[in-house]
Regions:
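Bacterial N-terminal signal peptides that target proteins for export
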Residues: 1-8
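Conserved catalytic cores of phosphodiester-cleaving nucleases, focusing on short active-site segments
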Residues: 157-159, 168-176
Length: 260
């Protein structure tokens, strides 16, 4: 049932995108008719009931299913019997230890950073540098289907074991002490064709780094980390309808404004 709900949602979302891109003339045509009569089976009308029923249908979905249904690629579990997997896990372990040590240093770049969101890129850069220095491994920013490098969006890093060509995706996450069991959203994946960065069957990892509250002196202190295999990771859908300022403040929609 969850699989069906996910497929219906993805299909409806794709159809809505197509409808949004339709010619304006067609939009003008439909606006002349009443909404129920002009599009009784419109994708949005099919989508809304699924969103309202998300507590039953769209929770506890395996991330591996989401990846496969949106990209056609498989999320591979770590194989503890594989020499390649053991070697990569060991390399990531060493890189995580060295990254924490490096960035906790008083002179590190993060110690002059005020917002924790701005610290994340330093972890990505440090891990990438350390993993690239590991013989037999390559680590870089994953590219989209068009070959573009994007820092935003999942995943952050792509590791490849050069001899076997086995791919590992690594996504560093930072969280505060005491928030480990929080139910607030800390992970998201947005299915898009143009900006998709998952392009191979791969092992998917999250490296979670825990930090203390920023000290009065301004110092950041990271205390521990965990490497998580996402093969059995489950997610839920939180759908929202969005609009920009350009969408809101259209001249024809403004009915009053302040005096000049």
């Amino acid at each position: 049932m969850k699989k069906t709900a996910l497929i219906i949602f993805l299909g409806c979302a794709a159809l809505i995108n197509c409808m949004a891109a339709a010619p304006l003339a067609e939009a003008d045509k439909t606006s002349k008719a009443s909404l129920p009569e002009s599009r009784p089976e419109a994708a949005v009308d099919q989508l809304i009931p699924w969103l309202l029923d998300e507590s039953r249908q769209l929770r506890g979905i395996r991330f591996a299913e989401v990846i496969f249904d949106t990209t056609g690629k498989r999320v591979l579990p770590v194989n503890p019997k594989s020499e390649v997997d053991r070697r990569v896990v060991k390399a990531i372990t060493t890189a995580c230890d060295e990254t924490v040590k490096k960035l906790n240093a008083p002179a590190s770049a993060i110690q002059s950073t005020t917002r924790i969101n701005e610290v994340s890129s330093h972890f990505e850069d440090a891990l990438r540098e350390l993993l690239n220095a590991e013989p037999g491994l390559s680590c870089d920013l994953p590219r989209t289907a068009q070959g573009r490098v994007m820092r935003s969006g999942y995943p952050d890093l792509r590791i490849i074991a050069l001899a076997s060509k086995r791919v590992f995706y690594l996504d560093p996450k930072l969280y505060a002490v005491g928030s480990r069991d929080s139910s607030f959203r800390t992970f998201y994946f947005e299915p898009k064709i143009a900006t998709n960065k998952v392009r191979e069957d791969a092992v998917h990892f999250i490296a979670g780094f825990e930090h203390k509250p920023r000290e009065k002196s301004g110092r950041w202190n990271f205390t521990r980390w965990d490497l998580v295999d996402l093969a059995q990771f489950k997610v839920k859908l939180k759908a929202e309808f969005q609009g920009s300022n350009r969408d809101i403040y259209r001249p024809e929609a403004i009915v009053a404004t302040s005096a000049k």
